[in-house]
Design a protein with these regions (language model features):
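Short beta-strands and strand-loop turn motifs
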Residues: 55-58, 89-92, 123-125
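Amphipathic, small/basic residue-rich leader segments at the start of a protein or domain
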Residues: 1-85
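A general structural signal for well-ordered alpha-helical segments in protein cores
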Residues: 44, 72, 92-95, 108
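N-terminal glycine-rich flavin-associated loop
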Residues: 86-105
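Conserved catalytic core of Hanks-type protein kinase domains
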Residues: 47, 78, 101, 114-115
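Non-transmembrane alpha-helical segments in soluble domains
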Residues: 17, 99-100, 112
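Short alpha-helical functional segments enriched in proximate histidine and acidic residues
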Residues: 19-23, 98, 122-123
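Glycine-rich, Trp-frequent "lid" loop and neighboring beta-strands that shape
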Residues: 65, 105-143
């Protein structure tokens, strides 16, 4: 198995590191997690619009880049390296592949293009019957 990065993967890493060095960093973390969203929405728009991160591993028919999970894992690794609070992992690595694999055609058509362009974030929730406690809606309050 060849574990060397491709030229495209090196470019993804470089572009993401450059962007995070400019707009992220340890000083930006408290402000980002203090928002109602729990992340910096302006930086998320840059990651989505400029780099296409949420749609990196989504099929082109849904507005994604059509890359593999390896490129998405690389993006998640870089955002983790920068300690970036963002919806990338939950949205692009967890929810989007499940919607792509298990969603109805209507669900895929309605949700995946919005995930790919960054206008929709998503997360997973266990079915209520599997939860050990009574889940209730929670909206994060700004600090």
């Amino acid at each position: 198995m060849d574990t060397a990065l491709t030229t495209e993967q090196h470019e993804i890493r470089r572009a993401l590191r450059d962007l995070l060095a400019r707009y992220g960093g340890p000083g930006a973390i408290p402000a980002a997690v203090g928002t109602a969203e729990g992340y910096d929405p302006a930086l998320w728009r840059r990651l989505a619009g400029g780099l296409g991160l949420p749609g990196l591993a989504l099929a082109e028919e849904y507005g994604g880049a059509g890359c593999t999970a390896a490129e998405l894992a690389l993006a998640c690794e870089e955002t983790g390296r920068a300690l970036l609070p963002s919806p990338l992992l939950a949205t692009a690595a967890l929810a989007a592949p499940l919607i792509a694999a298990l969603g109805t055609p209507d669900q895929r058509a309605a949700l995946l293009p919005r995930i790919a362009d960054g206008t929709l974030t998503a997360a997973l929730r266990p079915p209520r019957r599997l939860a050990r406690h009574r889940p209730r809606p929670h909206r994060r309050q700004p600090r």
